[in-house]
Amino acid sequence: MAEPSGRYQQLPCEEEPEAGPQVAADAPPPYSSIAADSAAFFDYKDDAAFPNPPSYNVATSLPSYDEAERTKTETSVPLVSGRDDDFVARDDFEDADQLRIGNDGIFMLTFFMAFLFNWIGFFLSFCLTTSAAGRYGAISGFGLSLIKWILIVRFSTYFPGYFDGQYWLWWVFLVLGFLLFLRGFINYAKIRKMADSFSTLPRTRVLFIY
């Protein structure tokens, strides 16, 4: 029984001597080496390819509310270009202006319409036309129609006693008709002259009161 025990011998552990160097390899490097590497890294960051960030005061400085509103207003308002193009002389009025003023044909048409058909023709010609020539023609024709009927009633034998003792009323209607006739004719002549003078001036809008 002693022989088997003699065969087995305890061998020395080969891994135990290597434990010391492995522990030394797992230990962190010294602080001096880390500081040197960090300094080299930050020196590299100072190159032109990596500019320094702005300071805290510059990065955190925001404009005030008034400055922001003023900047927004200045950017939203468009620049006004030269206004010389708006004042270009025109050889004639536009079509819309011609429709508002009218021509001599419309004036004569509404004039005879109001003169022949009296107040019915006056209302039709005044309401159906939108030009100054048409309405002034209606006013002038109605004034002449009023003069016509005053003279008919005054000197006709079919209407006796209408102005007996009231000749002032006859004169009132006669003068009223004469004033309406002159007002329509003279105002239309002024408008035609004004249109000719405005044809070489900048764009102008004129309001005519009838």
Curated annotation (Swiss-Prot):
Keyword annotations: Golgi apparatus, Membrane, Repeat, Transmembrane, Transmembrane helix
Gene Ontology BP, a term: metal ion transport
Motif PPxY motif 2 boundaries: 53-56
Region annotation (Disordered) ranges: 1-31
Membrane topology: Multi-pass membrane protein
Domain of life: Eukaryota
Topology, Extracellular side: 127-132, 183-210
Principal cellular location given in the protein's record: Golgi
Transmembrane segments: 106-126, 133-153, 162-182
Keyword Chaperone assigned: no
Described function: May play a role in Golgi structure maintenance.
Full protein name: NEDD4 family-interacting protein 1-like
Organism: Danio rerio (Zebrafish)
Upper classification of the organism: Eukaryota, Metazoa, Chordata, Craniata, Vertebrata
